[in-house]
Every structure is written in C-alpha cells, then in structure tokens.
Design a protein with these regions (language model features):
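N-terminal active-site segment of His-dependent metallophosphoesterases
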Residues: 1-58
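Active-site-proximal beta-strand elements of phosphoester/diester hydrolases
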Residues: 4-12, 114-121, 188-192
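Active-site neighborhood of phospho(di)ester-bond hydrolases with catalytic His/Asp-centered motifs
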Residues: 8-9, 32-37, 59-64, 146-151, ...
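Active-site environment of divalent metal-dependent phosphoester hydrolases
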Residues: 12-17, 40-43, 65-70, 109-110, ...
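Short, glycine/charged-enriched secondary-structure capping and boundary segments
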Residues: 20-23, 47-50, 74-77, 131-132, ...
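Active-site neighborhood of divalent metal-dependent phosphoester bond hydrolases
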Residues: 48-49, 55-118, 122-143
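Short, surface-exposed, charged loop/turn segments at secondary-structure junctions
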Residues: 125-134, 159-169
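Acidic, His/Gly-rich catalytic cores of divalent-metal-dependent hydrolytic chemistry
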Residues: 162-249
C-alpha cells in the first residue's frame, strides 16, 4: 500500500496560493503535513486556518508567526513589517481560530519511522537553516532519516552520508525535482513556501513524499498573485508584503 504525504509550509495567510496548491496536487496524496506559519503577512488568516482544519491533516505544527498571532509570543524579535502584519492578524483572527493556533504543537514531531517535521530546525523551532553549519547541527539533532523543515521560505535539500554533506536540491529552481532516499543517508528538505517564497521563484512551493517508495517530488505552482496582492492592499497591510509576492523575495 502506497503512503504519500502532501507537504506544505509557510502559507502565511495566502488563500490563493493554498487553494491552487490543493487543486493542482489534489488526489496525489493520502495525508497532509503542515510545517507551520499558517498565518502572518497575508490577508486571509481565517480562511487559511479554516481550510487547513478542513483538510484534517495528519500532523500540523506551529511556526513563529502562529505563536505571535495566537498570543503565545510578543513578536518583539520581528522586524517592523512582520510585527505590524502579525498584530493585524491577531486582531483579525476569530477566537476559535486563535485557539486552534494556540494548541498547535511545536516541532520537531515524528511522522513515522522515516520522517520527522519541524518549522525551523530539529534543535530549535525558531532557528533558521540556511547553510552547511546549520545543516550539520540539524542532522545531529534529527531523529529520523528525513527531516522536513520550513521557515526560510527557500526550497533546498541537504544530504549527509559517509561523513559528507552535500546540497542535493536548490537553492533555486526545484520544480519537478525528484529525490530518492538512500537507506544509508539522512536528508533535510525544505519544499519552499506556499504563500511567500523568498528564493527568487514567486510560484507556490510544495512537495509530495512517497513514504513507501522512499522519495520526494518538489513542486512550484503558479497561482493568482494579483488577487493575493489586492487583498493585502485592501486590508491596509504594508505595501511591501504585496510587492514581494511578485518577486519571490
């Protein structure tokens, strides 16, 4: 029996991106994994949380924006734009959706014997995993052969085998890339951001992991960016949050 997980992360209140990903990849997965930051930046926090809840994911973990939007953190470490947006999100959320975010577990969380998920890294849910040193520390902390992470909004993949670290995906164009998991290696993989990519590709990022065949396929999916931008402007959120969606930065 095949078991396939849809992997989505960093939706950030972008309903257009989320719905497009679900439409394009619908029917190609059995379960859903959500790696945090459902909200923040985008103008549809309630619709996104509602949609994620409707999916009944196998596992959802919190991101740093979810924590602030839920009132679990003050967001003092955020830059001015991010903090403005997340405080707007806090006010916009319904009590039920804020309560849902409050109860999301932190990462890392084991999915099965093959996979674990985290938002930032296996050693710190809020830390960023950008380079080789970050990856080595994450490999040391990871408890499964494959660790799926988010937070950076950059699609990338690292492999560690025979005491050697290599980048096996990105950063850059990862659309359509398929990686097979070797039984003698460990992997750290970021599928990119659904709602606010920052790797130069404005298309929504997602992945499907086939746990039975031990492989992952990365996707970049065009979505109606202009509508997401229109909603951000209509909500009175910072203009930069609308502009950056077109740039993928």
């Amino acid at each position: 029996m095949t078991l396939r997980y849809l992997v989505i992360s960093d939706i950030h209140g972008n309903l257009e991106a989320l719905e497009t990903v679900l439409t394009v990849l619908g029917g190609r997965h059995d379960k859903v994994l959500v790696l945090g930051d459902l909200v923040g930046y985008g103008a549809d926090p309630n619709a996104v949380v509602d949609r994620v809840r409707q999916l009944d994911p196998h596992l959802v973990i919190r991101g740093n924006h979810d924590k602030v939007a839920a009132g679990l953190d003050d967001g003092e470490s955020f830059n001015a734009v991010a903090r403005s947006a997340v405080l707007w999100t806090y006010e916009a959320l319904t009590p039920a959706n804020r309560d849902y975010l409050t109860k999301l577990p932190s990462g890392p969380q084991a999915v099965d014997d093959l996979i674990e998920i985290c938002h930032g890294t296996p050693f710190d849910e809020d830390a960023y995993l950008f380079d080789d040193l970050d990856a080595l520390r994450a490999f040391e902390a990871s408890s499964r052969p494959v660790c799926l992470f988010g937070h950076t909004h950059v699609a990338v993949g690292f492999r560690y085998a025979d005491s050697a670290l290599e980048i096996v995906a990105g950063p850059g164009d990862t659309a359509g890339l398929v990686l097979e998991f070797s039984p003698d290696a460990k992997y750290l993989i970021n599928a990119g951001s659904v709602g606010q990519p920052r790797d130069g590709d404005p298309r929504a990022g997602a992945a499907i992991v086939d746990a039975t065949a031990r492989k992952i396929e990365l996707f970049r999916i065009p979505y109606p960016i202009e509508e997401a931008q229109r909603k951000i402007r209509l909500a009175g959120l910072p203009e930069v949050l609308a502009k950056r969606l077109s740039l993928g930065r």
